[in-house]
Regions:
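Transmembrane helix segments
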Residues: 30, 37-47, 164-211
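Junction motif at the cytosolic side of a transmembrane helix
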Residues: 221-225, 236-262
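Transmembrane helix boundary and interhelical loop/hinge segments in multi-pass membrane proteins
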Residues: 18, 76-101
Length: 262
């Protein structure tokens, strides 16, 4: 069996297990949908608009792609961090490495699984946004949307794998992953419009990749946004974080449980 077939089988196996895991379904699918409905219902009932890149846009067109970005981080970063750390602690990663399957196929399958989950989740959220809140993709933005989804997922996965070096136990991963994701959600223009943040907090948020992923996706759906949909600075920051995460992951990833030999 070729490595490519093994990669697809590994992703399929992971997807099947993920959909059977109640906690994973709640965490990566139901939770983002609840957030989407709550934010759009609460904020759309105020004045109905917020400021985005100097123009007024309706809340639904702002929050819907923001929640998509947040779900990418939930799945690619936090979800993968927790899954890998838990499987390592149980000794499953060590067993995988002892099989003839190349190591990169296992990790690649995990990333491919996350990409598929993100695409499914993005479609669900966008359909809900379109049907319930009249949110629509900008003309000619489909290609940019695909780039942001794939690049954003790859970046978050790379960072999630890299952080497994620090989260030596499943409990630590279950605390660190959601904590980082929630904090960045507040400072990256996901939960609170960027125009409502203090300048220093906005600047802090833009250091991290979630702000650029959220802004990129928001540009894809904002009818009043100007300029190119595929913004070079957002893509560059996401790519830089992805490369940094990949380098750290390659150099520091551990297959053995805490306390085992290297």
């Amino acid at each position: 069996m070729s490595d490519a077939v093994l990669l697809l089988e590994q992703a399929r196996f992971g997807l099947r297990g993920g959909f059977r895991n109640t906690r994973a379904v709640i965490f990566t699918i139901i939770f983002p949908i609840v957030l989407l409905v709550l934010f759009n219902s609460v904020f759309s009932g105020k004045n109905g608009t917020t400021r985005f890149q100097g123009v007024r846009v309706d809340f639904a067109s702002y929050f819907t792609p923001g929640i998509v970005a947040y779900s990418i981080m939930l799945t690619g970063f936090s979800g993968l961090l927790i899954a890998l750390t838990t499987n390592r602690e149980r000794g499953l990663l060590k067993r995988y490495r002892g099989t003839p399957m190349p190591s990169w196929v296992f990790l690649g399958g995990q990333i491919l699984q996350s990409v598929v989950m993100v695409l499914i989740m993005a479609i669900v959220l966008i359909v809900i946004g379109s049907v319930a809140y009249d949110v629509h993709l900008r003309s000619g933005a489909l290609g940019a949307l695909a780039v942001y989804l794939v690049l954003g997922t790859a970046t978050m996965c790379a960072l999630g794998i890299a952080l497994t070096r620090v989260t030596t136990t499943a409990d630590a991963a279950s605390a660190v992953g959601p904590f980082v994701t929630v904090i960045l959600g507040f400072v990256s223009g996901v939960f609170i419009p960027v125009s409502s943040l203090p300048n220093w907090l906005e600047d802090l948020g833009r250091v991290f990749p979630l702000a650029h992923l959220a802004e990129g996706l928001q540009r894809c759906f904002s009818p009043a946004a100007t300029g190119n949909v595929l913004d070079g600075s957002n893509v560059a920051v996401l790519a830089a974080w992805g490369v940094a995460g990949l380098v750290i992951a390659v150099r520091t990833f551990r297959w053995d449980p805490q306390g085992a030999g290297t």
